[in-house]
From Swiss-Prot:
Protein name as catalogued: NADPH-dependent 7-cyano-7-deazaguanine reductase
Residues binding substrate, per UniProt: 72-74, 91-92
Organism encoding this protein: Prochlorococcus marinus (strain AS9601)
Function text: Catalyzes the NADPH-dependent reduction of 7-cyano-7-deazaguanine (preQ0) to 7-aminomethyl-7-deazaguanine (preQ1).
Catalytic activity from the UniProt record: 7-aminomethyl-7-carbaguanine + 2 NADP(+) = 7-cyano-7-deazaguanine + 2 NADPH + 3 H(+)
């Protein structure tokens, strides 16, 4: 492969980058609307950038929710989460934005988002956000 061809392929967004950039949360119909149940999703490789330093921040996201009429499609959720990797955003803002999007798209009965950020500079941070009313 020539150097010119290699340089050319790195200048435009690659197909994976385009898919991530265009991603949005997709939901499908809850297969059992009559039953109250919980779904837990782990996303252990979340990244965004610190808005002050530009350094990467890493976190494990845990989503637990009780679906109402819709259920989150996992691949779309993964791609949506990957879209934050190059965005300079605070921990508080990104977790609230993700929660807003989850609530607006899925309309769950109840949802809990936990974000456990890896330590940086000897400081770690964990955020927990809840929305809705948990049902028994």
């Amino acid at each position: 492969m020539s150097t010119a061809k290699l340089e050319d392929s790195t200048q435009r967004p690659l197909y994976g980058e385009r898919i991530i950039e265009e991603s949005k949360i997709i939901c499908f119909d809850n297969p059992n609307k009559k039953r109250i149940y919980e779904i837990s999703i782990q996303l252990p490789e979340f990244t965004c950038k610190c808005p002050f330093s530009g350094y990467p921040d890493f976190a494990k996201l845990n989503i637990t929710y009780q679906p109402n009429l819709k259920v989150y499609e996992l691949k779309s959720l993964k791609l949506y989460i990957n879209n934050f990797r190059d965005i300079k955003i605070s921990h508080e803002e990104v977790v609230n934005r993700i929660m807003d999007d989850l609530v607006n798209e899925g309309l769950p009965h109840w949802i809990h988002l936990n974000a456990a950020f890896n330590p940086r500079g000897n400081v770690s941070m964990q955020l927990d956000i809840f929305s809705g009313q948990k049902r028994n």
